[in-house]
UniProtKB/Swiss-Prot annotation:
Family affiliation: Belongs to the metallo-dependent hydrolases superfamily. Adenosine and AMP deaminases family. Adenosine deaminase subfamily.
Name of the protein this chain belongs to: Adenosine deaminase
EC number: 3.5.4.4
UniProt GO MF annotations: 2'-deoxyadenosine deaminase activity; adenosine deaminase activity; zinc ion binding
Cofactor(s) the protein requires to work: Zn(2+)
GO terms under biological process: adenosine catabolic process; hypoxanthine salvage; inosine biosynthetic process; nucleotide metabolic process; purine ribonucleoside monophosphate biosynthetic process
Residues with site note (Important for catalytic activity): H221
Gene (UniProt): add
Organism classification: Bacteria, Pseudomonadati, Pseudomonadota, Gammaproteobacteria, Alteromonadales
InterPro entries linked to this entry: A/AMP_deam_AS (IPR006650), A_deaminase (IPR028893), A_deaminase_dom (IPR001365), Ado/ade_deaminase (IPR006330), Metal_Hydrolase (IPR032466)
Record text on cofactor binding: Binds 1 zinc ion per subunit.
Keywords for the protein's UniProt record, in alphabetical order: Hydrolase, Metal-binding, Nucleotide metabolism, Zinc
Length: 331
């Protein structure tokens, strides 16, 4: 099912959406933060999706607990370190960890640039202990508005040498991409690649805007592209990568079932598409789970899964030499 001769990658993986349950428990008690449960065992349902629960509101509440316990920069560093460990332990050869420093900082009024530094330090420490390649993607959380995104952008650009790309995430309908054109001009001027959450809550026009105005070469989720034949043709022709996260799409009610997920439609249209975990801590999944789901629920063959695996390597924000090194390590 997973081809061991091809690097296994996860390109759409939120660092701040992957905080271990025991870490939430320990940090909560360490910092005197009131938690919604009185034991580690009973905490899990408040911070992780249970069974077939599918609700965007419930999902976001669980996600909020992941950052509620980030009371100081040491906590941020710990979570970043554990993200590297989790990536390695799940069998990944390469992961791009994306994070929103404003979202991580807001509960306890941490310095945004300090959060970025703590993430970088935690990842560096993790890479000393675990054999996995990691790159970082900064996120601007559009839901907090343009001014907050400017603060976030400045904190991230102060450490641009530690980033490969920038992302736009959050409320796609309330805060359309047009509001952030100037922000992304600064991103392009800084020489960073661009991905954007688009076509998830909004229609295909949001994806066109992300590609044509923000400069995105990859799109997160993008499920609504299938309703726009011209866009599908454009995506395939220009190798715009779709970072697909089927289980997360189900958990957030972006799709009503795996059977309704458009992954197969993208594949058949020749669009470059990869499998990813999104918020693995909230969804309680790993990348192997997504490949199992792709086979059993999305009905992909082993040959198609291998193609998806290769797509991920092609889509990665890596140089050609880095890509070759990933493949060489699999021989």
């Amino acid at each position: 099912m997973i081809d061991t001769s091809i690097p296994l990658v996860d390109l759409h993986r939120h660092l701040d959406g992957n905080v271990r349950v025991n870490t939430i428990w320990e940090l909560g008690h360490q910092h005197g933060i009131a938690l919604p449960a009185d034991s580690l065992e009973t905490l899990a349902p408040f911070v992780q999706i249970q069974g077939k629960e599918t609700s965007l509101v419930a999902f976001l509440k669980k996600l909020d607990w992941m950052v509620a316990v980030l009371a100081d920069l040491d906590a941020v560093k710990r979570v970043a370190y554990e993200n590297v460990a989790d990536a390695a332990l799940s069998g990944l050869d390469y992961a791009e960890l994306r994070f929103s420093p404003y979202y991580m900082a807001m509960n306890h009024k941490l310095p945004i640039e300090g959060v970025v530094e703590a993430v970088v330090d935690g990842v560096k420490a993790g890479l000393k202990d675990y054999n996995v390649k990691i790159n970082l993607i900064g996120i601007m959380s559009r839901s907090f508005g343009q001014a907050a995104c400017t603060q976030e952008l400045e904190g991230l650009l102060a450490h641009k040498q530690h980033l490969v790309a920038m992302d736009l995430a959050g409320d796609e309908l309330g805060f359309p991409g047009e509001l952030f054109n100037d922000h992304f001009k600064r991103v392009r001027d800084a020489g960073l690649a661009i991905t954007a959450h688009a076509g998830e809550a909004a229609g295909s026009q949001s994806m066109w805007q992300a590609i044509q105005e923000l400069g995105a070469t990859r799109i997160g989720h993008g499920v609504n592209a299938i309703h726009d034949p011209k866009l599908m043709e454009y995506l395939a022709k220009h190798r715009i990568g779709i970072e697909s996260c089927p289980t997360s799409n189900l958990h957030t009610s972006t799709v009503v079932s795996y059977a309704e997920h458009p992954f197969r439609t993208f594949m058949d249209a020749g669009v470059l598409i990869s499998l990813n975990t999104d918020d693995p801590g909230v969804s309680a999944i790993d990348i192997k789970h997504e490949y199992r789901i792709a086979k059993s629920e999305l009905k992909l063959t082993d040959a198609e899964l291998a193609r998806v695996q290769r797509n991920g390597v092609e889509m990665a924000f890596l140089s050609d030499s880095e890509r070759k090194a990933l493949y060489a390590a699999k021989i």
